[in-house]
Design a protein with these regions (language model features):
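Flexible, charged surface loops at secondary-structure boundaries
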Residues: 17-18, 59-62, 94-100, 113-116
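Short hydrophobic beta-strand segments
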Residues: 24-27, 62-72, 102-104, 165-167
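Conserved AMP-binding/adenylate-forming core of the ANL superfamily
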Residues: 25-60, 157-180
Length: 180
């Protein structure tokens, strides 16, 4: 970590420049036996593609709120960093009806339908697989993200002192607080 790293996205960029091959995230699913290990470079690529999807396809802007209705999963970590990259506030377990966008897994589709904005669904299947039948009214993340760019540049600078993460207890953290 550099003293200049003030947002999670900046922290990831520093890790990528230091040692892109280093393992960064290991995910285990005891129910399915799935194990996923992502290097810094692979994780950063998923984040870049997801941030491009957010910014270019879903028209998300800094300050927008994204209700993140996902369980503890490696793809949840990707979405958290992608939101930070764009300047979107990731609202963990947030109210879909009050959010500008919603990202959901298969178990929270009905709750996510309350969002009048863009809706993205993740199957949470091994290796980031697609839904066998895409849920009506949702973009299937596994279909939409592969074609996105491998590098991300925000249209507007992200301020480390702006809200970055909304917590289930109602508290909020800035990007700088998340890094601390």
């Amino acid at each position: 970590m550099n003293a200049s790293d003030r947002t999670p996205a900046e922290l990831l960029r520093t890790a990528l420049s230091a040692d892109p091959a280093r393992p960064l995230l290991t995910y285990y699913d005891d129910a399915t036996g799935e194990r996923v290990e992502l290097s810094v470079a692979t994780f950063a690529n998923w984040v870049a593609k997801t941030a491009n999807l957010l910014q270019d396809e879903l028209s998300a802007e800094p300050g927008d709120r994204l209700a993140l209705l996902l369980p503890a999963h490696w793809q949840t970590a990707v979405w958290l960093l992608a939101c930070s990259s764009v300047g979107v506030v990731a609202d963990l377990g947030g109210d879909a009806a009050r959010a500008d966008l919603v990202v959901t897994g298969p178990d929270t589709l009905e709750t996510a339908r309350g969002c009048s904005g863009e809706r993205v669904a993740l199957s949470l299947r091994p290796m980031g697989g697609r839904f066998p039948q895409p849920p009506e009214g949702f973009a299937d993340y596994a279909v939409e993200v592969p074609g996105q760019g491998d590098h991300f540049a925000p249209y507007a600078p992200v301020d480390a002192d702006d809200a970055s993460l909304a917590l289930p207890d109602g508290g909020e953290l800035t990007g700088a607080q998340v890094v601390e």
